[in-house]
Amino acid sequence: MRIGIGIDVHPFAEGRKLIVGGVDIPSPKGLEGHSDADVLLHAVSDALLGAAALGDIGLHFPNTSAEYKDIDSMILLKHVGRLLTKNGYRTVNVDAMLLLEAPKIAPYVADMRRNIARCLDIDTSLVSVKATTNEKLGYIGREEGAAAHAVCIIETL
């Protein structure tokens, strides 16, 4: 078994959709980034790539490439899942934590879990998504951005 960790951060911006875990969440502002800026899926992707020692999302999906401009991060996570399989691994578990003050994401967690599981072709019971605030501290507390942390376990096929 191998363990990976992923962390991602994006600032909020006016005129952007808030996409988290592949879910379009109603919000007056969204996250800024080269892709759809899905902070949760980026952290999960990095955790999986790290566990397999396959680099990170910046290596596989550079923000200098027009190919990935505004791309749906579920497409990226599916690619990571296929890359793991190609290299002889399968996902055992994904545990992810979202850090943001608002909006509350509890109503969307089940959909996020299903999206991650579907992208990785695993059972939803193997995916955990949680959220917390930053207690009004720092850039997250000031609602300037959001972050996500993810830990995963993979094993050889």
From Swiss-Prot:
In which residues is a divalent metal cation bound?
8, 10, 42
Q: Which Gene3D superfamilies match?
A: 2-C-methyl-D-erythritol 2,4-cyclodiphosphate synthase (3.30.1330.50)
Q: Which cysteines are disulphide-bonded? A: none
Where is the site Transition state stabilizer?
A: 34, 133
Q: Which cofactor does it need?
A: a divalent metal cation
Which enzyme class, named as a word? lyase
Q: Which GO terms describe its biological process?
A: isopentenyl diphosphate biosynthetic process, methylerythritol 4-phosphate pathway; terpenoid biosynthetic process
Q: What is this protein called?
A: 2-C-methyl-D-erythritol 2,4-cyclodiphosphate synthase
Q: Which gene encodes it?
A: ispF
